[in-house]
Amino acid sequence: MCIRDSIVCNSFSERISEANIDDCLENSEYVIDCSDNFETRKIINEYCFRTKKDLISGACIGWKGQIFNFKFSSLESPCYECLFEGLDEEDLSCRESSIFSPLAGLIGTFLAIETIKNILKLNYSEENFLEINSLTNEIKKRKMVINSFCKICSNK
């Protein structure tokens, strides 16, 4: 439910795949990804890059989390593949590590903040991502750079 009639929020209970992603996300202006697996993140990343839709993505495993704001509407944004090239599901799985439950709420809050900044066209997050360590209460801003060999975005 939204306060304004002009805002439409969609969520999906089905698993995103290469076969259904166009149908699921074609009417989206922004994509907020909080999926729990690397394969889905890669599919969403490729779709958002291809369609030039901003992607706000969050992930957490154990006590640590990350928030990414990929500005694909800009021609100079790195992508998820630039950062995680060569890693697979086993490298980033929470099946064995689990998640510190309150951290998921914190990541969700940061996703909302980043989404609002995108809607308002505020550019404080460009080419950076946040790493959160909830065990030590540290939040670090990291620089994202385009991988010149990235199979998704290097042919801009």
PLM regions and their residue ranges:
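Adenine nucleotide-associated cytosolic modules
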Residues: 4-156
